[in-house]
Amino acid sequence: MKLRPLHDRVIIKRTEVEAKSAGGIVLTGSAAEKSTRGEIVAVGKGRILDNGEVRALDVKAGDKVLFNEGYGVKTEKIDGEEYLIMSESDILAVEE
């Protein structure tokens, strides 16, 4: 299945990072926090402004980002892979 996000939404594949304790022990399962980093795999056409114009997004597919996984973030499994669908405003930074 292929999804195309609408408007100012993006689809992100979470980047898994190895979590370690202060003592260097690798944490797994519930002891490890979920990463808030990922790679954008698809973007919508843009935000619809009050005057009807569409403002293109500042991010693009392939960007590596840091995001806020909050109330408006939807998790979806597609072909066995987990993806996040969120608004561009939930993205905090782009890795350069």
Swiss-Prot record:
It is found in: Cytoplasm. GO terms for biological process: chaperone cofactor-dependent protein refolding. The keyword Cytoplasm applies. GO terms for molecular function: ATP binding; metal ion binding; protein folding chaperone; protein-folding chaperone binding; unfolded protein binding. Keywords: Chaperone, Cytoplasm. GO terms for cellular component: cytoplasm. Gene3D superfamilies: GroES chaperonin. Heptamer of 7 subunits arranged in a ring. Interacts with the chaperonin GroEL. Belongs to the GroES chaperonin family. HAMAP family: CH10. This is Co-chaperonin GroES. The lineage of its organism: Bacteria, Pseudomonadati, Pseudomonadota, Gammaproteobacteria, Alteromonadales.
